[in-house]
Regions:
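A ligand-binding cleft/hinge motif common to bilobed small-molecule-binding domains
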Residues: 161-163, 291-310
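Early extracytoplasmic/lumenal segment of secretory-pathway proteins
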Residues: 74-164
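Extracellular/periplasmic juxtamembrane helices and adjacent flexible linkers that interface
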Residues: 85-87, 334, 342-402
Length: 402
């Protein structure tokens, strides 16, 4: 397949056309050029030749590596979930947050292709956006009676049913599902105590939620610096969080309840103007529509075109850390060891962090790795049955919210 890669191509053009080449850059010490931030700011203007010359890397040899990677690893995204019942035949089901589905799916698909070629191991996997399954799939999980109805490896996003007491008591306590390995935590994960001390759940990464202020809509109000600040009465009907169609994001509601109880939930509801998907929030800000403050994943904050209009606030008490969790059937750990090693390894972690999702790995370098995180806490997660608690929170929040 002709690639037409040459030294005058911009790095952005190469990665956009051939995303499977990202790891050629990373493994040759050029990972900083293909992070999410660099792809937005630097890569659209930096040519391949200039980047390689500045690091004394042979251009012809590097292009050969790029072309070899493209030939051996055509981009094939991991397929989605065909049906609820089909999950029992899967080695892995991934329910990923928006923003992570595509980079995870492509990287994992490339890994599976290499695994099959090298070791003859064929893995059945499906990757879905968590938002597509948030209501339907998690309700279905609550009807499952046997571990045989579930995939061998489950990767899921947010504070979901897998952390609820029914799943925990039925599948985790008896040892049917467990974590894979205890990862050494970097400073932000260690400070927030995000890793499970009981080693029953593996945290692959977290989706950090931040506050984005539309400076045109502040009306002389001071910018918030903590999560408690956005509950102040001055922000009445000024706040937009993820939600819509009778649903609001519990990754925001749960920490508010933990910190301030029902009074905090009432204050939050009074300040919410509307519930939107983060992509809709980006549109709203770019069109300078209503709303002064937006709670959204940091990934989406970087996609706002009118950066001059906004202030991204990483709160002093940390971005809200919404987890991406891995669980595996205990009986499958040895059989699926190559897959599990990849999922918790530094290679995938660098991709996740580069996409704006902090990882526990102390050896991974990215801007998000240095910023504080705010975690619900494992005592809170184990003491409370999250699905039941979410219902109780909604009883207070929903009648007061738009």
């Amino acid at each position: 397949m002709p690639t037409n890669i040459h030294a005058d191509l911009k790095i952005y053009e190469i990665i956009q056309r051939f995303p499977q080449t990202q790891w050629v850059f990373v493994t040759n010490g050029l990972g900083a050029l293909v992070t999410d931030d660099a792809m937005r700011v630097l890569a659209p203007f930096l040519t391949l030749g200039t980047a390689l010359k500045s690091r004394f890397i042979n251009i012809e040899a590097f292009i050969d590596m790029l072309e070899d990677t493209i030939t051996r690893n055509p981009v094939i995204d991991t397929p989605g979930l065909v049906s609820m019942e089909a999950q029992k035949d899967l080695s892995l089901l991934g329910l990923m947050p928006c923003g992570l589905k595509m980079p995870f799916s492509r990287a994992f698909s490339q890994f599976l292709n290499e695994l099959q070629a090298k070791e003859g191991l064929c893995i059945q996997a499906a990757v879905e956006g968590n938002v597509n399954q948030e209501l339907s799939y998690y309700s279905y999980v609550d009807t499952i009676e046997s571990k045989d109805e579930l995939p061998d490896i489950i990767v899921s996003a947010d504070f979901n049913v897998f952390l609820g007491h029914r799943f925990y008591n039925r599948f985790v306590v008896p040892g049917h599902f467990t974590a894979y390995s205890a990862l050494p935590a970097g400073p932000n994960f260690s400070d927030a105590q995000i890793l499970d001390p009981e080693n029953e759940y593996t945290i692959l990464c977290v989706n950090p939620l931040v506050v984005v202020a539309n400076l045109d809509k502040l009306k002389n109000r001071d910018l918030p610096h903590t999560w408690d600040d956005i509950l102040a009465p001055e922000w009445k009907k000024s706040l937009i969080i993820r939600g819509g169609d009778g649903f609001y994001c519990h990754a925001v509601l749960l920490p508010t309840f933990k910190a301030s109880g029902n009074k905090g939930i009432e204050a939050l509801a009074a300040n919410v103007l509307e519930g939107l998907h983060p992509a809709q929030m980006v549109n709203r800000i770019d069109n300078n529509g209503p709303g002064a403050l937006y709670v959204m994943p940091a990934f989406f904050a970087d996609r706002i075109r009118h950066q001059e209009r906004i202030k991204v606030i990483w709160p002093d008490d940390g971005a809200l850390a919404s987890p991406v969790i891995l669980q595996v059937k205990s009986e499958k750990k040895e059989e699926l060891k190559p897959v599990l090693d990849y999922l918790v390894g530094s290679q995938l972690a660098q991709i996740l962090a580069g996409a704006g999702f902090p990882v526990p790995h102390a050896d991974v370098s990215a801007e998000v790795q240095t910023k504080p995180l705010k975690w619900l806490g494992w005592n809170f997660l184990r003491q409370n049955d999250l699905p039941a608690l979410n219902v109780e929170i909604d009883k207070v929040f929903m009648p007061l919210a738009p």
